[in-house]
Amino acid sequence: MTQYIPDTQRPIGLFDSGEGGLTVARAVADLLPQENLIYACDTAHFPYGPRPLAEVRAFFRRFMEFFVEQNCKLVIVACNTATAAAIDLLLADAFPIPALGVVQPGAAMAAEASVTGRIGVAATQGTCDSGIYPQTIRLFRPDAYVVQQACPILVIRAEEGVISGPEVRREVERCLAPILAERVDTLVLGCTHFPHMAKVIQDVVGPAVRLVDPGKATAVQVADLLRRRGLLNPGPGPGQRRAFTTGDPQRFLEVACRLWPGGVDAAAHIHLWSQQE
């Protein structure tokens, strides 16, 4: 007999190409520690940034099927590139369960945080090419000047669990130099891998530039949505945090333990395609 699980105790699903979305999972866990989380990442196809958005969109749709199978009550697309690829599906509520991305909350926070209206976005190539951040920021602040920069090397470093040190600092300096040359006062960490190295980034950009972590803004939006729908988990105690990966679960856990010590209870492999690339 299938065990009945109250709607409030159903898990929240989080999706990313790799370990980056753990920054969003951590933000949700900090704000809603009683919630059960299922983190699913597509490390078999990592990184998403250089891939065509149509391909990323297809990957995302398959993961949504997985989250439905896992009886999730809500899904967070903890990946900016996947959010850009599937934005029309998210806006149209095209799935059996609510799903929301990280771009809109991050864009709204950046528009509010900036004093001068000069906003930088560090992201993947796919996110930059989509134009989703400039478009969304200007919905909240039409006069905003937005400059973007793709930082693929930082995505790779964070996925490896290398988030500090002299070489990382040099790479951050090189990546962000074009943005800082535009005299921005706000920088959106437009890839969920980047908050893992927020301390180095803040040190490079200086105290006059405010960092915006879309994951934290998304966690607030998730809490509000669950509250309005009567789906907040009342507890007791901390929720379970399980991970699934299309890659090597042991490798995932090794890196996850460095990026979020104690944050993931267990990891397992999932095979979602008949033949993985």
Curated annotation (Swiss-Prot):
GO terms for biological process: cell wall organization; peptidoglycan biosynthetic process; regulation of cell shape. Its EC number is 5.1.1.3. SUPFAM superfamilies: Aspartate/glutamate racemase (SSF53681). Substrate binds at D16, S17, Y48, G49, N80, T81, T192, H193. The keyword Chloroplast does not apply. Pathway: Cell wall biogenesis; peptidoglycan biosynthesis. The active site is at C79, C191. It comes from the Bacteria. Pfam families: Asp_Glu_race (PF01177). GO terms for molecular function: glutamate racemase activity. Signal peptide: none annotated. Keywords: Cell shape, Cell wall biogenesis/degradation, Isomerase, Peptidoglycan synthesis. It catalyses: L-glutamate = D-glutamate. Belongs to the aspartate/glutamate racemases family. HAMAP family: Glu_racemase. Provides the (R)-glutamate required for cell wall biosynthesis. This is Glutamate racemase. It comes from Symbiobacterium thermophilum (strain DSM 24528 / JCM 14929 / IAM 14863 / T).
